[in-house]
A protein has these predicted regions:
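A structural signal for short, hydrophobic/glycine-enriched beta-strand patches
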Residues: 10-168
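Perimembrane helix-loop junctions in membrane proteins
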Residues: 13-20, 180-188
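A transmembrane-helix-recognition feature enriched in membrane-embedded lipid enzymes
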Residues: 160-187
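Hydrophobic membrane-insertion alpha-helices, especially the h-region
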Residues: 1-9
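Extracytoplasmic/luminal low-complexity segments enriched in Pro/Gly and acidic/polar residues
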Residues: 193-194
């Protein structure tokens, strides 16, 4: 039974990673990842590029950047994300930064609170492909009608070995979340990923 549960979950992580849903939504939500003195890491920049593409395609009129700060940081992941998007031409009044949360669950709960305060309900979540199912599940549990449009570039999707590691990580993290309703981002492979 356990093998079926793990295998089935891994298959769903892989399957949802391939879904790129660009239906119109109230907001595009970019989940945070590491930033260095306000400069997005390669992982975060790949997510931001995807969010800008969705904004430019008219998927939503607003982008929410999420993510807090690590000890010693001057910038939140959300600030670094907003600054990058504005430099790339997204109007500042169309980017909402939510600088709370140091893991996926905390970030999505804070983002959901902000989104719902504005009377919005639907969100396209932008993250890495393997993170999509867990992020969508957490966003739904936080009260959003959410779907995903993952990145398909950046360091997390480069090699089969990297992909396999992240599918295994996300399978474990999703099973842990479903069992406990607690975050599982400490199942770490790479410090750039939030």
């Amino acid at each position: 039974m356990g093998v079926l549960l793990v295998g089935g979950t891994a298959f769903r992580v892989w399957q949802v990673a391939r879904i790129d849903d660009r239906d119109k939504a109230d907001v595009v939500v970019v989940l945070g990842a590491a930033q260095y003195a306000g400069k997005p890491s390669k992982v975060l920049e790949a997510r931001l590029r995807k969010a800008k593409l969705l904004f430019d395609q008219g998927v939503s009129e607003y982008v929410v950047t999420g993510g807090g700060r690590r000890e010693g940081d001057r910038y939140t992941e959300a600030q670094a994300g907003k600054n990058w998007l504005v430099r790339q031409g997204v109007p500042a009044d169309r980017v909402i930064e939510v600088g709370q949360g140091n893991d996926t669950l905390g970030t999505l709960r804070a983002v959901a609170d902000e989104v719902k305060k504005r009377g919005w309900k639907t969100a396209v979540i932008v993250s890495d492909p393997w993170h999509s199912l867990r992020a969508r599940t957490m966003a739904s549990d936080a009260g959003l009608d959410a779907w995903t449009s993952p990145t398909h570039s950046g360091p997390i999707v480069q090699t089969r070995e990297t992909q396999a590691k992240y599918i295994l990580r996300e399978t474990a993290a999703l099973l842990y979340y479903r069992a406990t309703k607690a975050g599982a981002d400490r199942i770490a492979i790479d410090q750039e990923v939030g």
